[in-house]
UniProtKB/Swiss-Prot annotation, chain A:
Red blood cells. Involved in oxygen transport from the lung to the various peripheral tissues. Residues 1-142 form the Globin domain. This is Hemoglobin subunit alpha. It comes from Latimeria chalumnae (Coelacanth).
Swiss-Prot record, chain B:
Heterotetramer of two alpha chains and two beta chains (an easy dimerization is also reported). Keywords: Heme, Iron, Metal-binding, Oxygen transport, Transport. This is Hemoglobin subunit beta. It comes from the Eukaryota. GO terms for biological process: hydrogen peroxide catabolic process. GO terms for cellular component: blood microparticle; haptoglobin-hemoglobin complex; hemoglobin complex. It comes from Latimeria chalumnae. Disulfide bonds: none annotated. CDD domains: Hb-beta-like (cd08925). Residues 2-146 form the Globin domain. The keyword Coiled coil does not apply. Belongs to the globin family.
Amino acid sequence: GLTAADKTLIKSIWGKVEKETEAIGVEALVRLFKCFPQSKVYFDHFTDLSPSSQKLHAHAKVVLGALTKAVNHLDNITDTLHDISLVHAKKLLVDPVNFELLGHCLEVALAAHFATDFTPEVHLAIDKFLYEVEKALFETYR
Amino acid sequence: VHWTETERATIETVYQKLHLDEVGREALTRLFIVYPWTTRYFKSFGDLSSSKAIASNPKVTEHGLKVMNKLTEAIHNLDHIKDLFHKLSEKHFHELHVDPQNFKLLSKCLIIVLATKLGKQLTPDVQATWEKLLSVVVAALSREYH
C-alpha cells in the first residue's frame, strides 16, 4: 500500500496539478483517445472528442475532481470512489483495462508538464496511487 | 503493419532529438524503480535498489544503450521489424526466460522518458505514433514465444 513517503510525494505533485486540473484532464483524455482509440466506444454520446469539446472539458473536470478527492483521502480511496465505481460497474459497463490506459496517459501528461518534478520516485508514488484508484473503481464490478 | 508518411516523419523527428544513452538509462531506471520485480533479470548488474545506485551503475547505461541501438535499427527498418527481432525474440524466450509483460512495462517507461525530454512536443498524435512503434516492437519480441 501507500507509504508515508508515497503520500508526501503524491500530495506534492498534485499541488501543481490542482493549478491546471482542467487542462491536464483534457490532455490525458485526448491522449487516451488518440493512443488507444478503442476507448472512444464509451463516448459515442459526446459527438465531439476534440480538445475544444465542451463536453470533454466538463468530463475532464469531473475526472480530475474525483482524483483530487482521492488524493485528499489517501487512507480511504475505496470508500471515496465507491459511488463512481458503481456508475462504471453497473451503468457504464466500462472494461476496467481502460482505467489503466487512462492512468498511463495521465502519467504521460504529468511527465510532459512537470519534467523535473516527475522523478522516478514520484512516478512510482503516482503509479501506486493510480493502482489504488483502479482497484477502488473495480470494487463493485462483481 | 502500414506506416503513413506522417508516422515515418514523426518517428524520425523525435528520434533525432534523443540522446540514446541518456534515454536508455532513464527508461531502465524507471523500470527498476516503478516495477522493482523486473530487476530479477539483472541480478548480475549488482545494486539496483535505489535511483542513486542505478544512476551510477555502468551496466545499466551499457544495457540501456544496447536497447536503444536495437530500437534505432527498428526505426530505420520500419517495414521489417518482425524479421529484425526474430533472433532477439528467440533469445528472450529460450535463453533469458523473460516474461513478455516486461516489454510492455519498459515501453511505458520509455514513453514517459520521452515526455520528460520533449514536454509539449510529445503531443497526443506524436505519442500515438510512438505507442504504435513500441507495440510493434513488443509484438515482434513476443512472436517466438511458444
